[in-house]
Amino acid sequence: MNILSRIFARTPSLRTRVVVATAIGAAIPVLIVGTVVWVGITNDRKERLDRKLDEAAGFAIPFVPRGLDEIPRSPNDQDAIITVRRGNLVKSNFDITLPKLTNDYADTYLRGVRYRVRTVEIPAPEPTSIAVGATYDATVAETNNLHRRVLLICGFAIAAAAVFAWLLAAFAVRPFKQLAQQTRSVDAGGEAPRVEVHGATEAVEIAEAMRGMLQRIWNEQNRTKEALASARDFAAVSSHELRTPLTAMRTNLEVLATLDLADDQRKEVLGDVIRTQSRIEATLSALERLAQGELSTSDDHVPVDITELLDRAAHDATRSYPELKVSLVPSPTCIIVGLPAGLRLAVDNAVANAVKHGGATRVQLSAVSSRAGVEIAVDDNGSGVPEDERQVVFERFSRGSTASHSGSGLGLALVAQQAQLHGGTASLETSPLGGARLLLRISAPS
């Protein structure tokens, strides 16, 4: 009982459904045709019996004028019963006398046997009635035999349709089985999932939908891995880079707590604590921005007006550094698809590096657009960067020989990250103003 309940509880397979649907679809016309043939056979056998009775009656009518005793047995139909009535006289060629029925054809029962009777009236020379009858036994036997053949043919047709559907369904469901096997083989490995199915249009559409879904899952999984790696990197780097300034802060605080310092010494120690705290805050802020940049996706990219972005950066830099002269080289409107906040961060960091580490008093911003993309240049008149250090300074926590010790070492790393996120590069050159030129190249979308 449990096995049957499990069998019926399971949803039929697609192959089984195709077979059942085909069998039902084939059974409907087969049953209609079979019913028509069935009724046709029944009527045809009955009509044949009626013609048999007509032949027997036509054979007997010529003998009626000779007398009732002259009526012979039918040579072609030995089992036909012929009964003749003339007045009160009744004559039959068998020991069975057929009853007098209405003209034409009629059914009757004699001795428990069903008979088909054909009655013919002869008006002259004397009113005479001839009744010719035969049993249904042979007709019923022949009809049943033909009916059995019809049933066998119909059953064979339905079974053949089901078998044919079963064979065709094997080819129809093959793409779906391949899809199921490929889907089962998908795991969290190092390669992107591939679902390739050829065959039925429906299977191809499902495969495309599955491929898209798996790709989205894969992308989200990669983003999760990247986020986890970024979090681990953030924790490791933070621990490494913050340990030294935190130790210095602790030492200074212990000095303030344990020693009775003069006012000028006390102010100097407090200044060191404040500077160390600012350095820690700047480092944490830069690390946070690096982590945010690593988690950005192509969905975050929007149209950006580079000319307007540089104009705002120039105005803000003037307010942040009152002694700095910032100029913007006029250029046509340049719009690209990118990360507005990230590009602004890169420009701001380039300006801040020029002021803090290069001692620049003048900064010039410019942008040039071409088919290859956009090139943003930040020129300054500061001390510049030695040629052998122009690649190293883009690494995290790397400082040039001319850099001050107050920075986090992440400013140019943020610039390089933004260049990479936009499919471009970041580099340092010698500026026409005498200092350094930072070039941020952004590739055009393909």
Swiss-Prot record:
The modification Phosphohistidine is found at residue 240. Keywords: ATP-binding, Cell membrane, Kinase, Membrane, Nucleotide-binding, Phosphoprotein, Transferase, Transmembrane, Transmembrane helix, Two-component regulatory system. GO terms for cellular component: plasma membrane. It comes from the Bacteria. It catalyses: ATP + protein L-histidine = ADP + protein N-phospho-L-histidine. The keyword Flavoprotein does not apply. Gene3D superfamilies: 1.10.287.130, 6.10.340.10, Histidine kinase-like ATPase, C-terminal domain. It is found in: Cell membrane. Member of the two-component regulatory system PrrB/PrrA that is involved specifically in early intracellular multiplication of Mycobacterium and is essential for its viability. Functions as a sensor protein kinase which is autophosphorylated at a histidine residue and transfers its phosphate group to the conserved aspartic acid residue in the regulatory domain of PrrA. In turn, PrrA binds to the upstream promoter regions of target genes including itself to positively regulate their expression. This is Sensor-type histidine kinase PrrB. It comes from Mycobacterium leprae (strain TN).
